[in-house]
Amino acid sequence: MIQIYNRKTKQYDIEQVAGGRLLNTLYTTGRGRLGLKLLVKRKIYSSLTGFFCDSKISRKTIKGFAEKFSIDTNECESKVEEFKSFNEFFARKLKPSARVFDTSEEKLLSPGDGRLQAWENIDTEKLLQIKGMTYSLSELLQDEKLAREYSGGTYLILRLCPVDYHRFHFFDSGKCMETRKIKGEYYSVNPVALSKIPELFCRNKREYSIFKTDNFGDVLFIEVGATSVGSIIQTYIPGERISKGAEKGFFKFGGSTILLIFKKNMVKIDDDIIMQTKEGFETKVLAGEAIGNCIDKRTK
């Protein structure tokens, strides 16, 4: 059972996990771990899943999936019957009114829908993936020099579930550099998997870019793939001027994760998110939701 903090009600909701029973089998039993090693973590499994989700026949699963997980299809730009495949629905665009991005310069906004955790004054060689398990930023990036620049900074994990809106956005205006792609496995990013697989983020397929923001400095914007995520699609144009709230890209079917890493003294995350993280809970947020503030440039 996964409890998620709800900022509106100030209560804890129980997360509905798509394929929860299968996840537990794969990551907590000997038979499951064998299947994980031989097939599920590999690209071929994600490719086959992606092939089905791109097919016309997969559209028949959309209505049932949306109903089971209480997805508000009224937020979609397109009607449910207009989607030609499950992946089209999974990577759906929303009406502009469904996710509103505050244009205030000082506000840090969530880049996507998901479950958020945040840490301040980080040791880049001991980043948490879950309580009791750490990994190295230099290994994640495969760049020791770049990783050192973020020592003492702020680190955010935004975990997306299959039921979430899977497009992600720029949380500030600025320019985003070229994306670097790193090959890897396709482990789940569910807490069950994170608690069983050491250095999972460093093992999975991932992409990162340096987002040169107007108000938060140079931020590492990292996308981590997961089980069934055959593709991380970047839709932005590197080096071009970006407006706050503009789309950066999207994930195809599966769970996935976004990591944001800020340099020291650039951002202050909201107290409730920091407190919940310390208590071991994730906080549910939506794309465009305020999650912190930039630190006044005059104090730097």
UniProtKB/Swiss-Prot annotation:
Coiled coil: none annotated. Is synthesized initially as an inactive proenzyme. Formation of the active enzyme involves a self-maturation process in which the active site pyruvoyl group is generated from an internal serine residue via an autocatalytic post-translational modification. Two non-identical subunits are generated from the proenzyme in this reaction, and the pyruvate is formed at the N-terminus of the alpha chain, which is derived from the carboxyl end of the proenzyme. Its cofactor is pyruvate. GO terms for biological process: phosphatidylethanolamine biosynthetic process. Its main location: membrane. It is an enzyme of class 4 (lyase). It is a peripheral membrane protein. Keywords: Cell membrane, Decarboxylase, Lipid biosynthesis, Lipid metabolism, Lyase, Membrane, Phospholipid biosynthesis, Phospholipid metabolism, Pyruvate, Zymogen. One of its GO terms (cellular component) is plasma membrane. Its EC number is 4.1.1.65. Binds 1 pyruvoyl group covalently per subunit. The active site is at residues 113, 169, 256. The keyword Membrane applies. The keyword Glycosyltransferase does not apply. Pathway: Phospholipid metabolism; phosphatidylethanolamine biosynthesis; phosphatidylethanolamine from CDP-diacylglycerol: step 2/2. Heterodimer of a large membrane-associated beta subunit and a small pyruvoyl-containing alpha subunit. Catalyzes the formation of phosphatidylethanolamine (PtdEtn) from phosphatidylserine (PtdSer). Belongs to the phosphatidylserine decarboxylase family. PSD-B subfamily. Prokaryotic type II sub-subfamily. This is Phosphatidylserine decarboxylase proenzyme. It comes from Ruminiclostridium cellulolyticum (strain ATCC 35319 / DSM 5812 / JCM 6584 / H10) (Clostridium cellulolyticum).
